[in-house]
Amino acid sequence: MLMRQKGIIIKAVDYGESDKIITILNEHGAKVPLMARRAKKVKTGLQAQTQLFVYGLFIYNKWRGMGTLNSVDVISQHYKLQMDLYVSSYASLAAETIERSMDEGDVAPYNYQLLQFVLEKIESGTSAQLMSVVVMLKCMKRFGFTASFNRCAVSGNDTQADLIGYSFKYDGAISRQEASKDVHAVILSNKTLYLLDVLQKLPIDKMNSLNIHQEIIDEMSDIILMLYREYAGMFFKSQKLINQLKRLEQ
């Protein structure tokens, strides 16, 4: 059966010497794995069309199991996401988070909207690292956990100015008054906790201007990755490149 669906490539894996297996998140919010024959050969024209983040109309044959890609009518190549290693690595983290949050057969229209929103924001100049934080905040529940950043997990104190870190012992933010009860709490700036709470609750269609200092973005990114590792046992493949880039900076 010949299928035509709009979608975005969220995963691309080399298969053999000349083929690729790509996964698209289609416009209905479903993951569709496709075999792209000879996609690594320049002459086929599929090499550029099967890169990560390509948004287009995918035409493929589907019977049982994995479909076979015929062609792609590219709507957006998202070149900016591929020209800078930092941008590409954090955009990959966002895509990987969404891809791994879904089991086979899941249909999640919101995930498609979220991915489109994030890629468009990055294209327009918003920090890719910040947008990866947004995705990870929005996908937490799909990995089986949540996190509270707006009140002390020990006392219930919801005075934002009193919050000074995140406690894995008590599973939530911790205030300065209770800090002695967890000497291993991760110390965070008050602004980081506040913005994590805002971004977690704010609908994506209300996120207009996102201008946040890099130090705050770094803190948010670090604690979010720690939360995923601690509560969901997740280590993302994209992190490997991110960690390598950070080491080169030191």
From Swiss-Prot:
Task: Name the gene that codes for it.
Answer: recO
The uppermost taxa in this organism's lineage are: Bacteria, Bacillati, Bacillota, Bacilli, Bacillales
A Gene Ontology biological process noted in the UniProt record is:
double-strand break repair
Protein name per UniProt: DNA repair protein RecO
Keyword field contains Membrane: no
Q: Which organism is it from?
A: Staphylococcus aureus (strain MRSA252)
Give the domain of life: Bacteria
Function, as annotated, reads: Involved in DNA repair and RecF pathway recombination.
Q: Which Gene3D superfamilies match?
A: Nucleic acid-binding proteins, Recombination protein O, C-terminal domain
Q: Which family does it belong to?
A: Belongs to the RecO family.
- What cellular component GO annotations does this protein have? bacterial nucleoid
* InterPro entries reported in the protein's UniProt record: ARFGAP/RecO (IPR037278), DNA_rep/recomb_RecO_N (IPR022572), NA-bd_OB-fold (IPR012340), RecO (IPR003717), RecO_C (IPR042242)
UniProt keywords, alphabetically: DNA damage, DNA recombination, DNA repair
